[in-house]
Amino acid sequence: MKVHMKSLNYLLVFVFALLLSTAAFSVDKGYVGEEGTEIEVIRVSAPPPEYPRRAVRLGVEGTVRLEFDVDTDGSVLDPYVVESNPQGVFDRAAIKAVRKFLYEPPTYNGTSVKVNNVQIDLTFKLT
């Protein structure tokens, strides 16, 4: 019974943390063309990342900076971690979440374009 209650307590803490966790996002900008013109990309869908269970259990918070491209259809291409703090704790959850992001199909001078080197910060915070 004691082991069952301990498991239940962990589950309740995890669920509570998921409900109260927030993911803060930075302004999304990237570059187009050979001249590297900076443009903004508009995010229309951004499901929140899953808070890793171990981080919830240990009460860990952190930030992950990701970089990726936005394709002409608004989908995210090739996301990778630029830096994270604490290192490695939230990387997998951040990449998994950003792969589900959707942007308005980007245009530049009336033409559909792929936007390169978009960087965002995902902040994992227990509240």
Predicted regions and their residues:
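Charge-biased low-complexity segments
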Residues: 2, 6-10, 22-127
